[in-house]
Amino acid sequence: MFKLVKSSLCAFCLLFMLAATAFAAPAQVEPSVQQQYPDIQVPVVTVPGNPDATAAINIEIEKNIAAFISQTDECYKDNEDWNKVYMGNSYTVTCNDDSLLSIVLTKYINVEHAAHPMRYIHGLNFNPQTGEKIVAFDLKEFSAEKYGKDIYTPELLTNKLAKKAAENDGLIIFDGILPLSSLPEQFYFDADRHVHFLFQLYEIAPYVCGVIDVDMDTESDDYLMYR
């Protein structure tokens, strides 16, 4: 009898360990394409063993893509070249571990006869264990756990931008932008769990600067990218 109970307990423990491993496994991300918009690539996420988190994450992604399509439609519906407006989206998974999933969406709009195409780079960040979306407010907790203080602040981001602008390496910031009073809405995590803030075209700088990507965690001088 004792051997039977011991054997059953061992089997239960093994199943529990396998289930826990599956639950903690990185999410799977596969591309899907909108039938009406073949150039819009949509990431479809599966969190193994966690259908609730899977559903919550995919709902957020679908809402984001749907908003992009509807806002573009609304913006250009009265344009005489509306039938020559091209929309697209691609994505990159920048962080995928047991507690962080970060997906960067690169959206573009090209209108015939326009001066130039528009591009938007947005970060979608999730806790894959719960499916909850991670927003800028949550970064205080991440910073406190990692550094014991908040490094994701408008003041520190202002310092990084001001330093690069002073180096005359190509960053031209519009007058009146600095100091920042708030953080940009868009950010993502890279594979090292560094937080990158994103400034969109024309948000703080001319079009020629592109989308500005600032790594808040790196100690390297190469903390700013033009995308």
Tell me the role of every PLM-derived stretch.
Residues 22-227:
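Compositionally biased intrinsically disordered regions enriched in Thr/Gly
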